[in-house]
Amino acid sequence: AGTDEKPIVTNSKKVPINHFFMDGVYVREMTMFKDTVVIGAIHKHLHMCFLLKGHLAVASEAGVNEYKAPCYIIAEPGEKRVLYAYEESVWYNTHKNEDNIKDIDQLEKNIVAVNYEDYEQYIKNK
C-alpha cells in the first residue's frame, strides 16, 4: 500500500510497477505475486482495469469479486479497493492523460485522492 501522503502503490521488489504512455493515455502495470495484498488508492476518475495474468479477489464497498485472467472491470471513481492475489497476477489500470504528463508524481495527483476528504473536495471543485 501507499502512505497517507502518497496513497498509490510504488514500484518495489514485492509489487513491481511499470508505466506506459500513449497520446492521451497512461497505463500502469502492477505485478502481484502469490498471496500479496494491495490496498488501492481512491481514484478520481472512471477507468478500466485489465487482469491479463492470474487470479485475484477484489474487495470494495460493493463486495468481494473474484477475477481470473483474462478479464477487465470498469472501476468507478471514489472507490477504494483491496486486491488479493491467489497466484502471480498482472493488473493494468488505464487512465486518461489529456496533457500527456510523464511525471509520475504529477500524474498521481491528477488520478488519485489522498483520502476521502480530498476526493470530496475534488468533486466539489470539478
Please provide the spans of the model-predicted regions.
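A short, N-terminal "cap"/entry segment at the start of jelly-roll beta-barrel domains
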Residues: 1-29, 61, 119-126
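Surface-exposed loop/turn positions
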Residues: 36, 71, 79, 87-89
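Structural motif
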Residues: 48, 55, 80, 88-90
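Glycine- and acidic-residue-biased ligand/ion/polar-headgroup-sensing regions
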Residues: 43-62
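Short acidic-glycine-tyrosine-enriched beta hairpin
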Residues: 60-82
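Double-stranded beta-helix
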Residues: 86-126
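Conserved short histidine dyad/triad with adjacent acidic residue
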Residues: 25-44
